[in-house]
Amino acid sequence: MYDIIIIGAGVSGCACARELSRYDAKILVVEKEEDVCCGTSKANSAIVHAGYDAAHGSLMAKLNVEGSRRMPALAKELDFAYDRCGSLVVCLSDEDRPALQKLYENGIVNGVEGLRIIERDELVEMEPNISDAAVAALWAPTGGIVCPFGLTFALAENAAKNGVQFRFDTKVTGLHPLDGGGAGWAVETDHGTLETRCIVNAAGVYADTLHNMADAAHPMTITARRGDYFLLDHTAGQHVRHTVFQLPGKYGKGVLVTPTVHGNLLVGPTAIDVDDKEATATTAAGLDEVREKSGLAVKDIPLRQAITSFAGLRAHEARHDFFIGEIAPGFVDCAAIESPGLSSAPAIGAMVADIVRGSLHLHNKPDFDPTRKGILDPKALDLAARAELIRQNPAYGQIICRCESVTEGEIIDAIRRTPGARSLDGVKRRTRAGMGRCQAGFCSPRVMEILARELGVPQSEITKSGGASKIIVGTNKDSL
C-alpha cells in the first residue's frame, strides 16, 4: 500500500509531490498521459503573476502572492529558467483610471510589494512600443516569466530524487474507501487497482470527476476554458521588455503580450468555455481575436513572425477560487487550479503537503535533498568551457536542432533523466529541440534516432506525444 497517491503530473501535482517528498512516506504520482506536463501546464501564458488581481481574502490571492515570493529561491534550488522582469497593466483611457486604481488598491491589501501607478511618459520609456492610446499603467516589479515545462520537470525530478515514483499512461477510472472500515482508498486504473492511505486530487480539468467520486453529496463542476495563443520567433522577442496586460475582465486577465525566458514573444490568450475537456485545437475566430485585441495595448506587433499557434485549457470553477482541502478522510482536493495556478504552484505544494502531513502524521526525511541540476546548456558557456565540454563528451559538439542550437548531449541527458523523455514532445519540452522556426521540420528524424537508440526500441515505436501518435506507420516496402 502507498501512503500517498497523487493523481495528475501537472505543475500542481508535481509541486505537491516535491513538497511531500520531504517526509518519510511511500508516494506515487499517477498520470494518464505519457509524461509530466501534458495538460494545462504545457499550454499557458508562462507568467508569474504578482498577485494584484485575485480577490482579496481568497485562497487564490494568498497563494499567488506567496508562490510569487517563493519562485526566485526555488528557481535557484531547482535550476529552471525564471526572470522577474515585472509586469504592466495598461489603462487605455482616462475613463478606466478608477478601475486601474481599484486594481492597485487590491494588490496593496493582497500584500504585493512595489506596486505603483505610472503615467504615460514613464510608460513609454519602459515600453517604447506601447499603444498610442495608453494613458497610464500599473507597474508590478514582482511579476515575472518562467518556463512552465522547466518548472514542472524540475519539481518532478527533485521529487523522484527523493523517492517519489511516477506511473504514466495510467488513467484513474474509479475510487472508493477501502472495505472493512480500514483507513485508506482503492484507486481503480486501467492497469489495475492501487491502494493508498491518502489521495491528492490534482487532476486539472478532470479534478471535478474525482472530487465527485469521493464526495457526491457536495458536487463540483469544472469548466474547461480554452485560450488561443501565437508564439513569435526570437526576432520578435524584444518587442516588449515586460509582460503587458490589459485591464482584466469577466473572463480573466485579457490578451497579454510578453517576452518568454527563451527569447520569443508570446501573444494571447482568448477565454472561451468549451464542453470538450480535450478541445485544444486553435480556432480561426480565436486567433483573429488575439490579433485584434493584442494591438490595443501594444502597437506594431510583428505577427507575421509567428512560428506556431496553440491552445490550452484552464480548469475554471464557478466560485473562481482554488479549492484545496481534505474533503473526506484521506482525500485531499487540489482542484479548480486556473490562472494564477502556475504562479501559485510552490505555495500550493506547500499547503497540500501541510494538510497531508497533519492527516497522516508524517515525519521529516533526514536525507531530503532540495536541489536539482538542470540540463546543461552549452550555449551558456564561454568558448573555452564549451570546447572542454566537447572534448570530454563529443555529443555536445553535435548540433541536432539548428533553430535552437540543441546538441545531442542535451537530448541524451533529457532521455536518461527520471522521469525522462520518451517521445518527440518530451524531448522538445525538456531541450527545445523542435521549438524553433522550422517547428521540428529539420531535427525530428535525428531526435527519433536518438530516442530509439537510448530507449532500445525501433523507430517505428517512437511517438510524437505517446499513445497512437506514432511517426512511422510502416516501411516503403510494406506499401508495395
Model-based region annotation:
Residues 46-126, 135, 254-255:
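Dinucleotide-binding Rossmann-like beta1-alpha1 core, especially the glycine-rich loop
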Residues 55, 62-65, 90-99, 138-157, ...:
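Short beta-strand to alpha-helix junction loop
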Residues 252, 261-262, 273, 277-399, ...:
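C-terminal catalytic lobe of FAD-dependent flavoproteins
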